[in-house]
Structure formats: C-alpha cells, structure tokens
C-alpha cells in the first residue's frame, strides 16, 4: 500500500486534522446500508463466535476437558478474549492509522481464524488461554474496533437504527454459532468444531471487510485518546454505565448454558438457551435502535437497562425448567444488548461527534476489566455457594446500577439543554435575569421528572 493509499484510508478511532465529520452532511442511507450490512455480518462472525463460547464452556465443565482446570479457569479463558479485545484499542488505532481501516480488519480476520485453529490443538488449559483467550481477542479487536464508529459517519437521524441493525448481526451470529457449535461438538467432536468455525468466519469476514468504506478521506495524524475526557462528569457517568452493563452482560453471555446443565437439562437443550438469548438480541437491537431514534437514546437506554435488571431478578431466579429458561433467555435478550446499540449515539449526543473517536478509545480500554472479570466473578460465586442465586442477584443489580448511571446522565443532559436555552435567550435579549434564575432553579427539576426526548 502506498503512502497515498494510507492517507486515504481513515480510521473511525482517529480524529482527522482536516474536514472533520459533521452530522449535517451524512447521507442517512445510500451506500451506508451496504456498510451497515457488512459490519453486521462481521459482528456475526466475530461476536457471534465469542457468544458461542457459552456452549464450549458448558462442554468443558461437563466433560472436564483439560486436566486440573477449574470452573474459574474455563470462564476466565473465554472472558479474557473480550478484555484483550478492548484493551488493544490503542494498538488497533495505530494500525488503522498506519495501514488503513481495511488492512487492519483483514489482519483481524486472519488472526481470529488462526486462533480457532490453535484452540483446536489445545491440550492444556493454558493453551486455551493463549488461543481462544488472547489471540482470539486480538483478532476480534482488530475486526470490531475499527468498524464500530463507521456507522455514525453514514447516518444522522437513523443513526441508532443503523447501529442497531449492525449490532444485531452479533445476535444472529450468536444464534447460528451457538446452535451449530453444539451440534458439531456432539456429532463431530470439539476439534472439528473449532476448525469449521475458523474456515466459515474467515470467508465471511474477509469478504465483508472488502465492502466496508469510511466517508472521510483526510489523513488522520494524531491518536484519538484524549484522557482529558476522564475529568468530565458526563463522560464518567457513561463509563460507569458501561462498566456496570459489562459486569452483567457477559454473565448472561457466558453462563446461561452452564446454568442449564446445573438445573438438569441435556447438552442439546443447554445449547439452545444462549442461542435464544442471541435471537432475542437479533430481534431487539434494531427495535431498540428505532425506538431510540424516536423517543430518545438516553431514555431508551435507561428503560432497557432497568427492565433487564428486573427481568433477571424476577424470571431468571425462578427459571428451573427448560421452557421457563428458554422464555427468559429470549425475553431478556430483547433488552440486554442496549449498550452496544446506543453507546456510540449517546457519546455523539453528549460529547459531540468530534469527541466520538476519543470517547470510544477511552471507553474500550476502561471496559476491559469489567468485561474480563464478569463471568469469573459469577462462577466463583456459584462454586463458593453451590447455588446460582448469588450470581443471579449480582447480574440483576449490575444492570440496575447501570440504569441509575443513565438516569443521572439524563438529568445532566436536560440541565445542559436548559442552560443553553437560557444563555441563548439572554444573548438575544428575550429574557431577563429573573427568568434566567427561574429556568435554572425550577425548570431543571421539573423537566427531569417529566418525559422529555433525550
């Protein structure tokens, strides 16, 4: 690739020096739908395989695949991939700047497939940590991180809807891979399951990466990793929301199949539980995106996060049969993935489009620890108490805590709107000092307690 080609291959995790992206000139469609579909398929063949680790985990725990490995080790091997994916965000940013977005994603597609082949050759638990943990996380990160912010370049009014469709690919991929992985393991064995996943994902990811384009051709010359955001209260609220969401989300992703085994379901039934959870996400994410564009992204994020917490506390704790657990997995899947749909649009709305790259880069690194620790914490609670109740309570309250962060963020955003309106009116001479004081003192409290599209 020539220097000129590198310059024309921008990365969504970088801030261009010239021609910064603006919301006004986004096409809100056109080739953006091709990009959205391509990103959805990439998500399906990266995040979908990652979600299928719940089936691998249930198999490992049931069969004792690796001598001396504990439940905590098995859980950590899978969740490590997510932590690695997020913590390499600065590296993915540098690669995309130097090589371009497309070559970076192609590298990720190859690395991810190699990691699955290596996992098929694993004979010790530390082999699994290096292959399906570290190496898979690197590959998935190089695929996901450069592509995530691209959707916001192509859409304005339909941004959350398009983002929901793209992220729904992870749900469909998780559904397909969970069912397929369970069937392949039962009929062909663990080794072939890994190798088939490697081949299929390589073909899909490479093809779709070649179709993905960014809109801004200016050379990106500085890293979008602005730590000054960490001193902004609104951004800290977003980080808090993300951390609590990840602590709950990956417990659901990785432990539902094992919970099915614990309550006495067979391996075929157990593999259907995470599959239906991902089906719920595939259905729910575009709907959440559409509703978010219509009624407010922060509003829907609060409602969906709180609803997920209540569903976990009300249904999962009482799910002791196949039918009830299947229903819970499908229903909670509709709302559990709201973070992935709305985090980018919320960052744009609260921090501005020019801070999206910085916000995402810092966010992914900050999410590494909670994403890695979530499933091991839940399984450690289970093995320590002999019951899933503690893990279920932990998961439910994490979602409720995330909803609290979003509610406070909503109050902050409304307050900012009121202040901006008062300042604008004061500048134009349309209000006096008493009206300004009244708006600041009373309007904020009243508006925070009533419905407003945010």
PLM-predicted stretches and their roles:
Residues 38-40, 44, 112-116, 126-146, ...:
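Hydrophobic core of transmembrane alpha-helices in multi-pass small-molecule transporters
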Residues 60, 133, 140-155, 162-163, ...:
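Intracellular juxtamembrane helix-capping segments at the cytosolic ends
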Residues 45-60, 178, 232-299, 339-340, ...:
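Extracytoplasmic gate region of multi-pass secondary transporters
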Residues 263-265, 269, 275-288, 292-346, ...:
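C-terminal transmembrane helical hairpin of 12-TM major facilitator-type secondary transporters
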Residues 110-123, 209, 306-320:
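C-terminal ends and interior cores of transmembrane alpha-helices
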Residues 60-61, 65, 95-96, 176-189, ...:
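Interfacial helix-cap and linker-helix signal at transmembrane-aqueous boundaries
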Residues 87-127, 292:
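Conserved MFS/SLC helix-loop-helix module at the cytosolic interface between two early adjacent transmembrane helices
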Residues 1-42, 190-224, 349, 356-358, ...:
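Intracellular terminal tails of multi-pass secondary transporters
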């Amino acid at each position: 690739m020539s220097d000129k080609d590198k310059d024309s291959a921008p990365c969504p995790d970088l801030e261009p020096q010239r021609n910064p992206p603006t919301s006004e000139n986004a096409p809100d469609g056109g080739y953006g739908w091709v990009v959205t579909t391509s990103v959805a398929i990439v998500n399906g063949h990266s995040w979908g395989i990652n979600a299928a680790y719940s089936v691998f985990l249930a198999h490992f725990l049931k069969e004792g695949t690796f001598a001396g490995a504990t439940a905590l080790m098995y859980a950590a091997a899978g969740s490590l991939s997510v932590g690695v994916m997020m913590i390499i965000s600065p590296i993915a940013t540098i690669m995309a700047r130097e090589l371009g977005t497309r070559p970076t994603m192609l590298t990720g597609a190859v690395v991810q497939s190699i990691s699955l082949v290596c996992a098929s050759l694993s004979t010790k638990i530390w082999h699994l940590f290096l292959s399906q943990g570290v190496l898979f996380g690197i590959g998935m990160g190089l695929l996901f991180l450069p592509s995530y912010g691209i959707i916001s370049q192509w859409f304005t009014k339909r941004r959350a809807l398009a983002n929901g469709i793209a992220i729904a690919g992870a749900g469909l991929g998780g559904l397909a891979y969970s069912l397929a992985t369970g069937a392949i393991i039962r009929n062909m064995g663990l080794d072939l399951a890994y190798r088939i996943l490697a081949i299929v994902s390589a073909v899909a990811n490479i093809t779709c990466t070649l179709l993905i384009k960014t809109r801004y051709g200016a050379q990106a010359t500085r890293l979008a990793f602005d730590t000054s955001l960490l001193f902004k209260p609104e951004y800290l609220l977003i980080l808090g929301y993300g951390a609590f969401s990840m602590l709950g989300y990956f417990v659901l992703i990785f432990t539902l199949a094992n919970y099915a085994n614990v309550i006495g379901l067979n391996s075929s039934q157990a593999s259907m539980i995470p599959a239906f959870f991902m089906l719920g996400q595939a259905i729910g994410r575009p709907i959440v995106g559409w509703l978010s564009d219509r009624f407010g992204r922060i509003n829907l994020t609060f409602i969906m996060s709180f609803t997920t917490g209540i569903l976990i506390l009300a249904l999962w704790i009482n799910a002791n049969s196949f039918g009830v657990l299947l229903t819970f997995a499908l229903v909670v899947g509709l709302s559990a993935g709201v973070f992935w749909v709305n985090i980018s649009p919320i960052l744009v709305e609260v921090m501005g489009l020019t801070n999206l790259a910085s916000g995402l880069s810092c966010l992914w690194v900050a999410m590494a620890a909670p994403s890695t620790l979530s499933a091991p914490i839940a399984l450690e609670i289970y093995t320590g108490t002999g019951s899933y109740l503690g893990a279920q309570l932990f998961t439910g309250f994490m979602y409720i805590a995330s909803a609290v962060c979003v509610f406070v963020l909503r109050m902050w955003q409304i307050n900012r709107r009121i202040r901006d309106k008062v300042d604008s009116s004061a500048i134009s001479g349309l209000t006096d000092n008493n009206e300004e004081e009244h708006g600041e003192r009373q309007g904020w409290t009243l508006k925070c307690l009533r419905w407003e599209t945010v």
